[in-house]
Design a protein with these regions (language model features):
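Proteins that catalyze or organize thiol-disulfide redox chemistry
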Residues: 1-174
Length: 174
Protein backbone atom coordinates (compact mmCIF):
# COMPACT_ATOMS: atom_id res chain seq x y z
CA UNK A 1 0.00 0.00 0.00
CA UNK A 2 1.21 3.49 -0.76
CA UNK A 3 -0.07 6.32 1.39
CA UNK A 4 0.33 10.05 1.47
CA UNK A 5 0.31 11.57 4.94
CA UNK A 6 -0.06 15.27 5.59
CA UNK A 7 2.54 15.47 8.36
CA UNK A 8 1.41 19.01 9.21
CA UNK A 9 -2.17 17.95 9.95
CA UNK A 10 -3.04 17.93 13.63
CA UNK A 11 -3.91 14.22 13.64
CA UNK A 12 -0.62 13.28 11.86
CA UNK A 13 1.98 15.27 13.77
CA UNK A 14 2.57 12.51 16.31
CA UNK A 15 3.12 9.94 13.55
CA UNK A 16 5.53 12.27 11.74
CA UNK A 17 7.46 12.84 14.94
CA UNK A 18 7.55 9.10 15.76
CA UNK A 19 8.94 8.39 12.28
CA UNK A 20 11.56 11.13 12.46
CA UNK A 21 10.08 13.16 9.62
CA UNK A 22 11.75 16.55 9.72
CA UNK A 23 11.60 17.67 6.09
CA UNK A 24 9.20 17.22 3.24
CA UNK A 25 8.66 15.24 1.18
CA UNK A 26 9.95 12.26 3.14
CA UNK A 27 9.46 8.81 1.66
CA UNK A 28 9.72 5.67 3.76
CA UNK A 29 9.16 2.04 2.85
CA UNK A 30 7.65 -0.35 5.39
CA UNK A 31 8.35 -3.98 4.47
CA UNK A 32 5.38 -6.32 4.94
CA UNK A 33 4.93 -7.20 8.58
CA UNK A 34 7.47 -4.65 9.79
CA UNK A 35 6.95 -1.48 11.77
CA UNK A 36 10.51 -0.38 11.03
CA UNK A 37 10.76 1.74 7.90
CA UNK A 38 13.52 1.93 5.32
CA UNK A 39 14.30 5.49 4.27
CA UNK A 40 14.03 6.10 0.53
CA UNK A 41 16.82 8.25 -0.85
CA UNK A 42 16.42 7.62 -4.58
CA UNK A 43 15.23 9.95 -7.30
CA UNK A 44 11.85 11.62 -7.14
CA UNK A 45 10.63 10.93 -10.65
CA UNK A 46 7.74 8.58 -11.29
CA UNK A 47 10.12 6.14 -13.01
CA UNK A 48 12.49 6.14 -10.00
CA UNK A 49 9.68 5.51 -7.53
CA UNK A 50 8.09 2.79 -9.68
CA UNK A 51 11.47 1.08 -10.08
CA UNK A 52 12.05 1.20 -6.32
CA UNK A 53 8.61 -0.25 -5.56
CA UNK A 54 9.00 -2.98 -8.19
CA UNK A 55 12.24 -4.02 -6.52
CA UNK A 56 10.68 -4.09 -3.07
CA UNK A 57 7.34 -5.64 -3.99
CA UNK A 58 8.46 -7.97 -6.78
CA UNK A 59 6.05 -6.33 -9.22
CA UNK A 60 6.49 -5.39 -12.85
CA UNK A 61 4.79 -2.02 -13.18
CA UNK A 62 5.76 0.76 -15.55
CA UNK A 63 5.30 4.48 -15.04
CA UNK A 64 1.64 5.15 -15.70
CA UNK A 65 0.54 1.89 -14.06
CA UNK A 66 0.84 -0.64 -16.87
CA UNK A 67 2.80 -3.87 -16.79
CA UNK A 68 6.26 -4.38 -18.26
CA UNK A 69 7.26 -7.02 -20.82
CA UNK A 70 8.08 -9.72 -18.27
CA UNK A 71 5.01 -9.45 -16.04
CA UNK A 72 3.37 -12.86 -15.70
CA UNK A 73 6.34 -14.78 -17.06
CA UNK A 74 8.06 -17.37 -14.90
CA UNK A 75 11.75 -18.01 -15.49
CA UNK A 76 11.59 -21.74 -14.67
CA UNK A 77 8.80 -22.23 -17.20
CA UNK A 78 10.44 -19.95 -19.77
CA UNK A 79 13.37 -22.38 -19.80
CA UNK A 80 10.91 -25.17 -20.67
CA UNK A 81 9.48 -23.03 -23.48
CA UNK A 82 13.02 -22.63 -24.79
CA UNK A 83 13.57 -26.38 -24.53
CA UNK A 84 10.37 -27.03 -26.52
CA UNK A 85 11.11 -24.47 -29.21
CA UNK A 86 14.63 -25.87 -29.40
CA UNK A 87 13.24 -29.15 -30.68
CA UNK A 88 12.26 -31.24 -27.66
CA UNK A 89 9.03 -33.24 -27.83
CA UNK A 90 5.97 -31.27 -26.77
CA UNK A 91 4.66 -34.21 -24.74
CA UNK A 92 7.91 -34.41 -22.79
CA UNK A 93 8.13 -30.66 -22.15
CA UNK A 94 4.41 -30.35 -21.36
CA UNK A 95 4.79 -33.02 -18.67
CA UNK A 96 7.74 -31.11 -17.19
CA UNK A 97 5.71 -27.88 -17.31
CA UNK A 98 2.79 -29.53 -15.52
CA UNK A 99 5.15 -30.74 -12.77
CA UNK A 100 6.84 -27.33 -12.48
CA UNK A 101 3.44 -25.61 -12.31
CA UNK A 102 2.34 -28.01 -9.55
CA UNK A 103 5.42 -27.00 -7.57
CA UNK A 104 4.15 -23.40 -7.72
CA UNK A 105 0.65 -24.29 -6.43
CA UNK A 106 0.93 -22.24 -3.25
CA UNK A 107 2.87 -19.50 -4.99
CA UNK A 108 1.34 -16.24 -6.24
CA UNK A 109 2.61 -17.23 -9.71
CA UNK A 110 0.29 -20.26 -9.84
CA UNK A 111 -2.29 -18.55 -12.07
CA UNK A 112 0.25 -17.89 -14.80
CA UNK A 113 2.02 -21.23 -14.28
CA UNK A 114 -1.30 -22.86 -15.13
CA UNK A 115 -1.50 -20.66 -18.23
CA UNK A 116 1.86 -22.02 -19.45
CA UNK A 117 0.43 -25.54 -19.02
CA UNK A 118 -2.67 -24.53 -21.00
CA UNK A 119 -0.54 -23.10 -23.83
CA UNK A 120 1.56 -26.29 -24.00
CA UNK A 121 -1.66 -28.34 -24.10
CA UNK A 122 -3.15 -26.19 -26.87
CA UNK A 123 0.13 -26.29 -28.85
CA UNK A 124 0.04 -30.09 -28.76
CA UNK A 125 -3.23 -29.83 -30.71
CA UNK A 126 -2.45 -26.83 -32.92
CA UNK A 127 1.03 -25.56 -33.85
CA UNK A 128 -0.17 -22.01 -34.40
CA UNK A 129 -2.17 -21.62 -31.18
CA UNK A 130 0.28 -19.14 -29.62
CA UNK A 131 0.25 -16.84 -32.67
CA UNK A 132 -3.55 -16.93 -32.98
CA UNK A 133 -4.15 -16.36 -29.28
CA UNK A 134 -1.61 -13.53 -29.16
CA UNK A 135 -3.35 -11.83 -32.10
CA UNK A 136 -6.73 -12.26 -30.39
CA UNK A 137 -5.54 -10.82 -27.08
CA UNK A 138 -3.69 -7.96 -28.82
CA UNK A 139 -6.93 -7.02 -30.59
CA UNK A 140 -8.82 -6.98 -27.30
CA UNK A 141 -6.10 -4.84 -25.70
CA UNK A 142 -6.11 -2.41 -28.64
CA UNK A 143 -9.88 -1.92 -28.36
CA UNK A 144 -9.41 -0.76 -24.78
CA UNK A 145 -12.15 -0.30 -22.21
CA UNK A 146 -10.99 -3.21 -20.06
CA UNK A 147 -11.22 -3.26 -16.29
CA UNK A 148 -7.73 -2.81 -14.76
CA UNK A 149 -7.64 -6.44 -13.56
CA UNK A 150 -8.46 -7.75 -17.05
CA UNK A 151 -5.91 -5.42 -18.62
CA UNK A 152 -3.22 -6.84 -16.30
CA UNK A 153 -4.34 -10.42 -16.96
CA UNK A 154 -4.33 -10.04 -20.75
CA UNK A 155 -0.99 -8.19 -20.71
CA UNK A 156 0.57 -10.99 -18.64
CA UNK A 157 -0.85 -13.62 -20.98
CA UNK A 158 0.49 -11.81 -24.05
CA UNK A 159 3.92 -11.65 -22.38
CA UNK A 160 3.82 -15.44 -21.91
CA UNK A 161 2.66 -16.07 -25.48
CA UNK A 162 5.47 -13.85 -26.79
CA UNK A 163 7.95 -16.14 -25.00
CA UNK A 164 6.64 -19.06 -27.06
CA UNK A 165 6.84 -17.03 -30.27
CA UNK A 166 10.17 -15.26 -29.72
CA UNK A 167 11.87 -18.57 -29.09
CA UNK A 168 10.25 -20.08 -32.18
CA UNK A 169 11.45 -17.26 -34.42
CA UNK A 170 14.81 -17.03 -32.68
CA UNK A 171 14.49 -13.35 -31.86
CA UNK A 172 13.07 -11.18 -29.16
CA UNK A 173 10.54 -8.48 -29.87
CA UNK A 174 11.22 -6.78 -26.54
Amino acid sequence: MIAKVDAEAENSKATAQDQGVSSYPTIKFFPKGSTEPEAYSGGRTEADLVSFMNGKAGTHRTPGGGLDAIAGTIEALDSLVQKFTGGSSIAEVAAEATKAAADLKSNAQNKYAQYYVKVFDKLSKSDNYAAKELARLDNILKKGGLAPEKLDEFTSKTNILKKFLEKATGKSEL
